[in-house]
Swiss-Prot record:
Organism: Homo sapiens
Protein name: Zinc finger protein 776
Domain (KRAB) ranges: 14-89
Subcellular location(s) of the protein: Nucleus
Family annotation (PANTHER family): C2H2-TYPE DOMAIN-CONTAINING PROTEIN-RELATED (PTHR19818:SF158), ZINC FINGER PROTEIN ZIC AND GLI (PTHR19818)
A Gene Ontology term for the protein's cellular component: nucleus
Positions bearing the Glycyl lysine isopeptide (Lys-Gly) (interchain with G-Cter in SUMO2) cross-link: 171, 196, 220, 247
PROSITE patterns named in the record: KRAB (PS50805), ZINC_FINGER_C2H2_1 (PS00028), ZINC_FINGER_C2H2_2 (PS50157)
InterPro entries associated with the record: GLI_C2H2-zinc-finger, KRAB, KRAB_dom_sf, Znf_C2H2_sf, Znf_C2H2_type
Main localization, broad class: nucleus
The keyword Transcription is assigned to this record: yes
Top-level taxonomic group: Eukaryota
GO BP term (any one): positive regulation of transcription by RNA polymerase II
């Protein structure tokens, strides 16, 4: 990457090309009517600025002597001066078709230059004028100018002793015009724009006053480009991209993005950022500052966007919708995670076993299987869990909370997955099918247990007698034979049973219920 350059100020003698932009007829045809008007205004304002700063223009490499065109300007920035042109010619006759019209308009109507000066035209329009012009500048140069090249190539400006910086409008003037038009669209709807930036005049027109030179302008576009011409620090120009700015911090940010360097580093954790604002937000992690507070529930956040996301909980707004299934979400990241269900994308892979996951948090939880880490402890019984969600689900055993209720039978469950499986009893859905015999099941666990019948697998072995079972529940019930445990007690007579099913059958003796009729 080439090193970024700081454009040096143009001091002493400069050509008008340093501040003017010329279009060919083909380029001119690409501009809209609004852009042409803007170009016209900007060139007039540039001419005004040059006059106000005490510049004079004449034919190249000649000593100034007063001829037929004089421009007198009383500037608030300079003492009285007189600028002269060294040849008795129509200036706009030497210009291209665009700049020529602008200079012609400025002189023909004795237009005041923003209220500070005036043109005085004393030109001879005799029939021999063009012939004299050819003899003075040469036939080749005249033909070139007739094709549209500007007279500015043959003119120079003698600057005052004070240094002055001309800012280029930009490599792509069309882009600059579009940018300025967009800025005007965004600000035109603000009711306080005139009170801040403009002074209303008669007829509803507004003057936009430059705060540095006090020069008034008829529109905001001209003021913006004028302020780029004022002496200031910079501009800072990136030699790679061609982008420029008058602010050193903006230039540093741009360079950081291009080089990959993050200039703003956190002193607490060594994390670095491209922008100072991002560093400020990050430091709230260490300070605990939460300046953004929800007006509904008083919950506070360290970032404004977090508050905006949270407020959708109260409003119920779900602006992010899945194109595949129509499901909507309150957060964009939730939509991105959901879309992986449709695409099958699993970007987070375990380095130990190669298993992949949709979400990073699921990978972190899975990795604790390999490390054996169980950082979440139940305060009631001391049991440890790999994830906070598993701990919260377990705590419902102690609290008796069953937040998931079936709308059909009002039966409630501790876990949402249990409710989902239960609802299949009402719907008759059996999504899990055995490939061996075609039998279907409500639950995936039931299918796995059934498949052990076909495979002959009995993974659960009794440590006392060596007997094996298909299901873990069957092993637990069997072990009660060895332990003598009978956990299911009848409330009527106190008789105890190893299995709950046996207790239910026994209770019919007391109720007189006859479940099976002939």
């Amino acid at each position: 990457m080439a090193a970024a350059a700081l454009r040096p100020p143009a001091q002493g003698t400069v050509t008008f090309e340093d501040v003017a932009v010329n279009f060919s007829q083909e380029e001119w045809s690409l501009l809209s009517e609004a852009q042409r008007c803007l170009y016209h205004d900007v060139m007039l304002e540039n001419l005004t600025l040059i006059s106000s700063l005490g510049c004079w223009y004449g034919a190249k490499d000649e000593t100034p002597s007063k001829q037929t065109l004089s421009i007198q300007q009383e500037s608030p920035l300079r003492t009285h001066w007189t600028g002269v042109c060294t040849k008795k010619v129509h200036l706009w006759g030497m210009c291209g078709p665009l700049l020529g019209d602008i200079l012609h308009q400025g002189t023909q109507h004795n237009q005041k230059l923003n209220g500070f000066g005036a043109y005085e035209k004393k030109l001879d329009d005799d029939a021999n004028h063009h012939q004299d012009q050819k003899q003075h500048i040469g036939e080749k140069s005249y033909r070139s100018n007739a094709k549209g090249t500007s007279f500015v190539k043959n003119c120079k400006f003698h600057m005052s002793h004070e240094p002055f910086i001309f800012h280029e409008v930009g490599k792509d003037f069309l882009s600059s015009l579009r940018l300025l038009q967009q800025e005007d669209i965004h600000t035109s709807g603000k009711s306080n724009f005139e009170t801040k930036h403009g002074i209303p005049l008669q007829g509803g027109k507004t003057h936009y006053i430059c705060g540095e030179s006090t020069i008034p302008f008829s529109n905001k576009h001209s003021l913006v480009l004028h302020q780029r011409l004022l002496p200031r620090e910079g501009p800072y120009v990136c030699s790679d991209s061609g982008k420029f700015t008058s602010k050193s911090n903006s230039f540093n940010n741009h360079q950081g993005v291009r080089t990959g360097k993050r200039p703003y580093q956190c002193g607490q954790c060594d994390e670095s950022f491209w922008y100072k604002a991002h560093l400020t937000e990050h430091q709230r992690v260490h300070t605990g500052e939460r300046p953004y507070e929800c007006g509904e529930c008083d919950k506070s956040f360290s970032h404004k966007h977090s508050l905006v996301d949270h407020q959708r909980v109260h409003t119920g707004e779900r602006p992010y919708e899945c194109d595949e299934c129509g499901k909507s979400f309150s957060h964009k990241r939730s939509l991105v995670h959901h879309q992986r269900v449709h695409t099958g994308e699993r970007p987070y892979q375990c380095g130990e076993c190669g298993k992949s996951f949709n979400h990073k948090c699921n990978l972190i939880q899975h990795q604790r299987v390999h490390t054996g880490e169980r950082p979440f402890e139940c305060t009631a019984c001391g049991k440890l869990f790999r994830s906070n969600s598993h701990l919260k689900e377990h705590q419902r055993v102690h609290t008796g909370e069953r937040p998931y209720e079936c709308k059909e039978c009002r039966k409630s469950f501790r876990y949402k997955s249990h409710l989902t499986e239960h609802q299949r009893v009402h719907t008759g859905e059996r999504p899990y099918e055995c490939r061996e015999c075609g039998k279907c099941f409500h639950q995936k666990g039931s299918l796995i247990q059934h498949q052990q019948i076909h495979s002959g697998e009995r993974p659960h072995e009794c440590g006392e007698c060596g007997k094996c079972f298909h299901q873990k529940g069957s092993l637990i019930r069997h072990q009660q034979i060895h332990s003598g445990e009978r956990p299911h007690e009848c409330g009527e007579c106190g008789k105890c049973f190893r299995q709950k099913g046996n207790l239910i059958k026994h209770q019919r003796v007391h109720t007189g219920e006859r479940h099976h009729e002939c």
